[in-house]
Amino acid sequence: MRQRKNVTKFIKRAYRDMGELKQYKRYTKTRLNIISNKVFLLKNELYPLQPKKKRGKRDQQLKTTYTKKKLKRILSLLFRIGGKIYRKKIKKKKINLKKQQEPFTQNLTLHRLFRKFYLNLKLKQFKLLYKKYKGNEKVIIQQLEKRVDMVLLRSGFVRSLYEARQIINHKHLLVNGKIASLPGYMINVGDIISFKEGSMKRKLLKRLKKGLISKKSRKRWTNRNFKFKRFQNYKRKRQKKKNKNKVRATGPNYLEISHSLLLISLIEEPKLTAIKYPFTLQPEKNIKFITLLKKYKRLR
């Protein structure tokens, strides 16, 4: 009886679909929960609880039906997903543990990442491309890669899309000798991109000379034979730190780049194998996320 009176406070629990972890006010024995480092109760350790008075439709009686098998299922599913529950963020909500395995959720996350990669591409622009090319996903990705700001980023002259759009908005960029003031300007095969003569061009040339890693410097480094291994490892680590912020003189196969003259030309239409993204997207396989625009009109 003393234990019942002293232990009055209880900890809030997550309300799961499988297992129905609910709140209990009075208990004696406690064991740590593997999920949240908290307390959970087994069937044998519970006291018969008094039912609450019904004040309305929302208030319901507490149930003591609680099995060990359901706990094991919950724990195994949580460890697969890697879900973590924190003390402050626990709320009474039904959560589908199989939600991440569904194809719709995977496609929706890819859809949002894809739009953020192109600097929050508006749905209006995205839907216009979808209607124009009749839902052909390969052609949509090719057209997005033909934009001027994306070509600058893929070439290596620019570190981010923000910098590329700043150059275009300030009218430092030329396409076939004419100013391109829009970042969504589409480039055709055979077009030549260049920079205006001025301060912006000089800054880019200085940065590229310092930043580019030439092939000759790599060969010299490999051919050297140092006497001591410790000194050799120290030099390699030091060189790796310097080369982190540098830009490599490489680009995709569908672009021809000259770093000395700051010229870019599109030779072929971009292929899906040559396109790379920072997140895990295989454009050859996971292109079906664009078809969400058909079924669900209110995508954010």
From Swiss-Prot:
A single GO cellular-component term on record: mitochondrial small ribosomal subunit
Molecular function via GO: rRNA binding; structural constituent of ribosome
UniProt keyword annotation of Protein biosynthesis present: no
Domain S4 RNA-binding stretches: 146-209
Membrane among keywords: no
Stored InterPro entries: Ribosomal_uS4 (IPR022801), S4_RNA-bd (IPR002942), S4_RNA-bd_sf (IPR036986)
A Gene Ontology biological process term: regulation of apoptotic process
Keywords for the protein's UniProt record, in alphabetical order: Mitochondrion, Ribonucleoprotein, Ribosomal protein, RNA-binding, rRNA-binding
Cellular compartment(s): Mitochondrion
One Pfam family in the UniProt entry: S4
Coiled-coil portions: none
Protein family membership: Belongs to the universal ribosomal protein uS4 family.
Full protein name: Small ribosomal subunit protein uS4m
